[in-house]
């Protein structure tokens, strides 16, 4: 029998991530120190799973704020008002999560919703008419490589294409159907990148399959089947 976990709590035994993030928001530490604390947490969590004998250890399950937001950034789903702030990648991410008021501008955070009737709230990705959904980030591969350098083989975890489309809010005139081909192409490129980096397993989470199907959802699901094939 082989064992796997779908993901690992990211906050830390002593809530290290929470406290470090709050220090960063108060400008008490630099981004480099926050990233170092995050790296230490990932190493600890992978090591715990390895020592417990887990066969399929997860990576890319770490997040500074929310995995849905992580996936949105991975797919270049970043509204213009946040890009126009011209902040660092990390600060743009936090602006989407928390809002931003400073020298670069004043924007509110993206909306939040309950994650499938749980008490967890996710950041709702916002797709504009001119949003180009494409693979635009290396977090998944980078964290796999980080674990590999420690001698730990992992399976990256990522929210799947079908669920991402169902979770997105479309703010323009274009419906979700107009983005099906682009999101499938982005995920195909993600799979190719995984193959190029000798990643044997990838876990695509599709919790939206528990929802009732709408007419548009059947098209999404067929597109998802195309990706899987």
Where are the language model's segments positioned?
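A short, hydrophobic C-terminal helix/tail in secreted or cell-surface proteins
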Residues: 223-229
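Domain-level signal for soluble alpha/beta catalytic cores
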Residues: 1-222
């Amino acid at each position: 029998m082989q064992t796997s976990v779908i993901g690992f709590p990211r906050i830390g035994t002593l809530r290290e991530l929470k406290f470090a993030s709050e220090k960063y928001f108060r400008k008490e530490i630099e981004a480099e120190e926050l990233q170092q604390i995050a790296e230490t947490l990932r190493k600890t969590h992978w090591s715990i799973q390895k020592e417990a004998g887990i066969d399929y250890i997860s990576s890319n399950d770490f997040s500074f704020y929310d995995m849905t937001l992580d996936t949105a950034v991975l797919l270049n789903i970043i509204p213009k008002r946040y890009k126009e702030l011209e902040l660092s990648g990390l600060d743009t991410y936090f602006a989407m999560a928390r809002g931003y008021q400073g020298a670069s501008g004043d924007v509110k955070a993206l909306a939040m919703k309950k994650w499938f009737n749980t008490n967890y709230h996710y950041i709702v990705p916002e797709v504009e008419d001119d949003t180009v959904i494409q693979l635009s980030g290396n977090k998944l591969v980078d964290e796999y490589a980080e674990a590999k350098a420690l001698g730990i083989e992992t399976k990256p975890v990522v929210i799947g294409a079908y669920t991402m489309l169902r979770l997105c809010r479309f703010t323009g005139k274009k419906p979700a159907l107009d983005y099906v081909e682009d999101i499938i192409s982005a995920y195909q490129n993600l799979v190719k990148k995984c193959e190029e980096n000798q990643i044997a397993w990838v876990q695509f989470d599709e919790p939206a399959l528990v929802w009732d199907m709408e007419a548009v959802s059947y098209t999404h699901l067929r597109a998802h089947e195309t990706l899987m094939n």
